[in-house]
Amino acid sequence: MAHNTVADMSGFELGMPALVCRWRIYNRHLPLANRHLRALLARQVQGKPLTKELVAWAKQHIEWTLEQGAVEYPQGVLMLILDTEGRAAMTVGPFEPLEDTRLDYLIHRAEKAQVEAAQTHIAPETLWLARNDMLLWDQGDLCVPSGASSLVAQLAQTMGIRVQPYQGLLDGVATGALTYDEAFLVSDEFGIVPASDRRGSHGVRMAQGYQRLIERA
């Protein structure tokens, strides 16, 4: 059943944001567009699923928005904002890399994303760990993978790396109960970000493979 409606984009101001998606642009294109849209359809806002109408609107406006905004920011970030009334807007802004890539900060970002996922069913950023030639990540009970996470899972499969869901991963890292070799953040906005103080070969390989796929998309 449709719960959200798409308002005419002309002549209105957005109200209180209920959802903000930030998707990385590469060379004036949105390489993970289909993955982002599938994840968007799985999201909920204020306990209600988004409609196919809204996702169709987003798909159409991605092209229009990139034609205009990506001229100024060809390597920028496309932002989709949905307010509490179900009205949507889309814009493009500059991309600014993470200045702090220490593990503690990446954990902090993953924790914030987990709070968002409890409400929307999608975590835009997740922490991944490498242990004994296997990747661990916590998708959450009710959540489906974000666009970036779904690509990383597929990329790992093509590399012959096993991916294992691990519930309570962030708590295990925080308490020291979980042993691991390296860590990296997977983000719809920032891609794969290896922790500067827990960097390793798996994260580097994944980041390189991710970048190659983005460049070819």
Predicted regions mapped to residue ranges:
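Short, contiguous acidic and Ser/Thr-rich linear segments
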Residues: L136-S146
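Conserved alpha/beta cores of soluble small-molecule-handling proteins
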Residues: M1-N132, G140, S150-A217
